[in-house]
Amino acid sequence: MTGRILLAALLAAAVGAAHPVRAAATPAHIDALEREVQELEDVRAVKTLQRAYGYYTDRALWSEVADLFADDATIELGADGVYVGRPRILEYLRRLGGGRDGLAYGELHEHLQLQPVVHVDKDGQHAKARWRDVGMLGQYGKSAAWSEGVFENEYVKRNGVWMILSAHLYITFVAPYELGWARLKPTDDPRTQVAKDFPPDRPPTVRYGQFPQVQLVPFHYHNPADARGDKAKAGGDSDAANDPLAAYERRARLLRDHDEIENLQGIYGYYFDKNLWDEVAKLFARHATFEDGQRGVYVGREHIRKALQLFGPQGPRQGQLNNYMQLQPVIHVADDGKTAKARWRSVMQLAQPNTDGQWGEGTYENEYVKEGGAWKISKLHFYVTALADYSQMWNKGPIPMPVASAVLPPDRPPTEIYRSLPGVYLPPFRYAHPVTGQPIDAHAPADTVLGRK
């Protein structure tokens, strides 16, 4: 039984004779709902595919990695050039891994696949996605390094199975752990030795310098704030309480809203990384609020745009690193599909020219609203957990959060007074426990410095 016939049968059984108006679901409704569900499944399949790439790469399972690619696929990592076809991809990756499958004793080769922004084409056979790749690399007793970069990938569905068609990793930096990213120097030839000994099939598609040089990876998507019209494919005005078909449509719409909010916040992070403040500001609703740590609350899109200058001037600059990774979302969309809330984690990698760089980590508690058919941020509140000089790390070098600017004062004071590490403030949970259904009644300790609870 085909998916369409099965869906029609299920809907007919669900609707039944008790709902004569829609007892025979129209072909148009069935087609729309089928496309909606299929696209949602495709997005999840693409995410699973890329995450499998990361897990296999972690353990140097090169045959398994290569099998994720289409026969005519390409891979391009950094400045090494383009390798074409699964056999060439396998040999290239194996050589990068030291000529063997599996890790050597004491080897660390973690490649986290984070912050996806996934779009499936209308044909349902092709997709594009942007991912952040964070590497923790090294050999026990010998070396340790960090790496970070951005994938802009393409995918293809063949015989019902999603595969990687093009993997292109733009490497931001590879840095020895002790030195850190802030003290890296430009290099004339960023190619690996493998690429020199095992030349690619094609030269690099783009040439760029790794950090501290400026790098802006092309976006495969437009700013979602520029979208117009309601995106709900299978939605309608039917009464879900009295119409089972409408209930299916509503469930599909809420799933789509969840994906669009995840894309929105991921896009926010990618724009924020490069100080693209004009694009960041567009992601906010007209009367939104923005609160970062103890800087206070900025109200309205125009004032938020000005406040973003507190993080540096518009656009990327040489020697500046402003990575704000958007991770670990817990998203809840309201039943009406018009508002949503989400909790996120952010890990920060920061640097300014001629500094040691900084580490940071924190939690977002955000709210969203659908405005003009597009999801936008209505409230962004970032709670800083820790901020530290890279050379000192958390145990020795935590530094205080910035406070309200005298040059560009906020519209309101901070909604909560707290200290980052060594303080242990707990941002309140806006959602119930997913198993017990009970609210999380956990409280932060009193701030002994400021006397506020």
Regions found by a protein language model. Give the residues of each.
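Short beta-strand edge/turn micro-motifs at domain boundaries
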Residues: 126-128, 148-184, 339-341, 361-396
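Short, surface-exposed coil-to-beta transition loops
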Residues: 111-113, 146-151, 324-326, 358-364
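Bacterial N-terminal signal peptides
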Residues: 8-17
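Short, low-complexity N-terminal intrinsically disordered segments enriched in polar/charged residues
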Residues: 24-55, 59, 67, 215-270, ...
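Bacterial N-terminal signal peptides that target proteins for export
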Residues: 1-7
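Sec/Tat signal peptide C-region and signal peptidase I cleavage site
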Residues: 19-23
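A solvent-exposed, acidic/Ser-Thr-rich amphipathic alpha-helical stretch
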Residues: 62-133, 277-348
